[in-house]
Amino acid sequence: MKKFTITLALSILAVLLVATPCNAKGKAKHVVLIGLDGWGAYSVPKADIPTIKQLMADGAYTLEKRSALPSSSAINWASMFMGAGPELHGYTQWGSKTPELPSRELNQHGIFPTIFQLLRDAQPEAEIGCLYEWDGIKYLVDTLSLSHYAQAPDYNKHPEALCTMAETYIKKKQPALLAVCFDNPDHVGHQAGHNTPEYYAKLKELDT
């Protein structure tokens, strides 16, 4: 997971698809944000991902979004959760657990503001969760703002574990906001190569 090659803004795609327009009569009660580490926009046209492509057709997306630099994991996950680049949040390394540079702003928990904390401030009783494969995620999400967070156990041997966890949590708690963060296709990309048959097989698996 040394590179975070998502140039595709599908980590926020779920938010864009689930959320309704600001002037709509009703607003979304539940938002699920799904992130796939190492997913390059170049793969979308030839990838066998009918579910995702249908979501794209029905919602909003971009294939032009670039990674924050340097293009590695903690920096980019932080940038998405915090809505700011590394020059503001201060996370500058692949496995950053705390900012290498002083954050320009700190919330009440001593971390750069996140989408999770903003929702917590607005809705103190909201159920807010984050489920992930890569353990580094927990350092970037302001866990004090979360109702629940957990890592999928032994996920390389049990790739279905995170999906099972998310399904159980959604059915039981019906969270207002949930982030589900996959380590793949990045892990496969490092092992077998990006833009390889193995890489596209993993994308197809994740689409289902």
Report each predicted region and the residues it spans.
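A long, amphipathic alpha-helix that forms part
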Residues: 26, 160-164, 178, 186-208
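Structural recognition of the beta-strand scaffold that forms the well-ordered cores
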Residues: 31-35, 62-66, 79-81, 118, ...
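Bacterial Sec-dependent N-terminal signal peptides
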Residues: 1-27
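Catalytic-site neighborhoods of secreted/periplasmic enzymes
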Residues: 89-92, 107-158
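Active-site nucleophile/metal-coordination loop of metallo-enzymes that catalyze phosphate/sulfate
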Residues: 25-28, 40-123
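Second-shell loop/turn segments in exported
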Residues: 38-43, 66-67, 100-107, 117, ...
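Generic hydrophobic alpha-helical segments
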Residues: 115, 162-167
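Extracytoplasmic/secreted cell-surface and envelope-processing proteins
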Residues: 42-45, 138-142, 187-192
